Design a protein with these regions (language model features):
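A short acidic, glycine/proline-enriched capping/turn motif at secondary-structure boundaries
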Residues: 61-64, 79, 132-134
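Glycine-rich, N-terminal phosphate-binding loop and its surrounding beta-alpha-beta segment
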Residues: 43-71
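Short, flexible, mixed-charge acidic loops at enzyme active sites
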Residues: 71-85, 137-146
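Active-site loop segments of alpha/beta catalytic cores
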Residues: 1-20, 53, 99-323
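Active-site-flanking structural segment that lines cofactor/substrate pockets
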Residues: 23-51
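Active-site nucleophile and cofactor-binding loops and adjacent substrate-binding regions
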Residues: 33-34, 59, 221
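Glycine-rich loop at the start of a catalytic domain that most often binds anionic cofactors/ligands
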Residues: 22-26, 64-76
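A gly/proline- and charged-residue-enriched helix-loop-helix capping module
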Residues: 77-114
Length: 323
């Protein structure tokens, strides 16, 4: 990553499932969250039908927690909800470290294999891996972990010593399975502030990223500018920014040390605006120097396929005019 290219790639490092693509692939949530074939079919649709230049899976952040034994709510009566973790553990002394081939992580691994069979070696596969601090929040509960960083730092570090290994083990196994890019997704780390990020998120993200023999991306929701320097310090190959972040400011903060991924607003622009609005936003971001054109967060299930395809068309138009 961060090397000269003929055209800026158009991908998503966050979730890509939409209702239109579910219909087209005959692969619907919630089944596609936990069935390898349906997961692969839906993930592939964002590439083969919508035109994104990579295949990205899964569609939620529950693979690691579910494989550890946490209860997951799949919202069985809804096909527009991503799953949520609803319970953790009564004790944190001997947390399980599941094999990447077990449980929902194993399902994701199987889906990766199916995707690779379908696209060959020419199309990148991106897999989202839950970041260590976010996984700690799944295990402990988000409200509790936010209190613990103040009142019980030893407990937080004890949990993180397990979660970073789970994230890293899973990511490493995915790379061996044929995944090209690992996207560490750390939404919970966005709400702890720079000081706590430095103490609790940064050290474990660094260890996880250093263990991966493939390009890595770190996505953190919200205004990540106050922690941008530390995001670079994690050692990832690319930083994915939320739509709330100025691409110009982020590029200035990164100073060429890694790639900048982003950051089309997935709702206000990608879902709600027409082709012209999407085109204008994409061209603005390309002119501001993003390395990879992508949504600033997970694609809304209500996004039309034509709007996703408009990202690629806008990129092509931008580079045609530069020749």
């Amino acid at each position: 990553m961060n090397k000269p290219v003929d055209k800026t790639p158009v991908v998503s490092v966050t979730q890509t499932g939409t209702l239109e693509l579910m219909n087209a692939a005959n692969a619907y949530w919630p089944a596609a969250h936990r069935d390898a074939k349906l997961m692969a079919d839906l993930a592939l649709a964002a590439h083969t039908i919508a035109g994104l230049e990579a295949v990205r899976l899964p569609f939620g952040l529950t693979g690691e927690a579910a494989s550890m034994g946490c209860r997951v709510n799949y919202h069985e009566d809804k096909n527009d909800f991503t799953p949520t973790v609803e319970c953790g553990f009564p004790s944190y002394d001997n947390l399980p470290v599941p094999s990447p081939n077990e449980g929902l992580m194993g399902t994701i691994m199987d889906a990766v294999g199916l995707c690779r069979e379908r696209v060959g070696c020419d199309v990148p596969i991106i897999v989202g891996v839950t970041g260590p601090f976010t996984l700690a929040g799944h295990i402990r509960g988000v409200n509790d972990i936010l209190t613990d960083v103040i009142l019980d730092p030893d407990l937080v570090n004890k949990i993180l010593e397990t979660t970073w290994r789970i994230s890293a083990n899973f990511a490493g196994a995915l790379v061996k399975k044929g995944v090209d890019v690992i996207a560490f997704i750390e939404p919970t780390a966005s709400i702890i502030g720079p000081d706590f990020f430095k103490a609790y998120a940064l050290p474990y993200l660094k260890k996880a990223a250093a263990s991966i023999r493939a390009p890595t991306v770190l996505h953190i929701c919200g205004d990540s500018l106050p922690i941008m320097e530390m995001m670079v310090e994690t050692g990832v190959s690319g930083i994915s920014i939320d739509q709330k972040v100025s691409a110009i400011a982020a590029k200035s903060a990164i100073r060429g040390r890694c790639s900048l991924v982003g950051n089309i607003d997935p709702v206000a622009v990608l879902q709600m605006k027409g082709d012209q609005g999407v085109e204008e936003e994409c061209i603005r971001l390309l002119s501001e120097g993003v390395s990879v054109l992508a949504p600033g967060c997970g694609i809304s299930p209500y996004t039309r396929t034509s709007q996703i395809a408009a990202m690629v068309k806008a990129r092509d138009k931008y580079f045609e005019h530069r020749i």
